[in-house]
Amino acid sequence: MTGGLPDAINSFINEGNIFNIRKIQSDIYDYYGDGASKYDKDHKLKIKRIYDLIPSNLEDKKKRVVVKNIENIKGKRFSNYQDEFDFLINSGIALEVKAISTTVFPFIESSGKNLLKLYLNDVGLLSNILYKTNIKAILNDEKASILELFTNQLLQAN
């Protein structure tokens, strides 16, 4: 529910007020999205759009980035957005998982270049976007996106 962001954790420990925690998480989410556009002015709109699509991608059946949804322009390819993906991933704003075609080591050799799944960098941010203050929905998490993000964070941290 709180995720791992220090301000959200401190608010939970000190106040235990879900509304304050969600306000902090909303502010951080907005800060990440706005911050991306300040550092890369040439790509800011596409970066913000990709970032804003992450939660809906996780709730989608395919759960991966669908390039045509970024600008709603047919004919665009994954490579058209490589700089934007790189910015979000390298800045730590988003976590990346690439699809692999075979389970042969090293995995990077069989990764699909155009099959990418992006995650927010904190489970609290996602639970805020999807469920706000509905604790029951968080605990039930029927589509398992919170658990999936938590597992991703755990694997990437170790």
Regions found by a protein language model. Name each.
Residues 2-158:
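Accessory nucleic acid-recognition modules appended to NTPase machines
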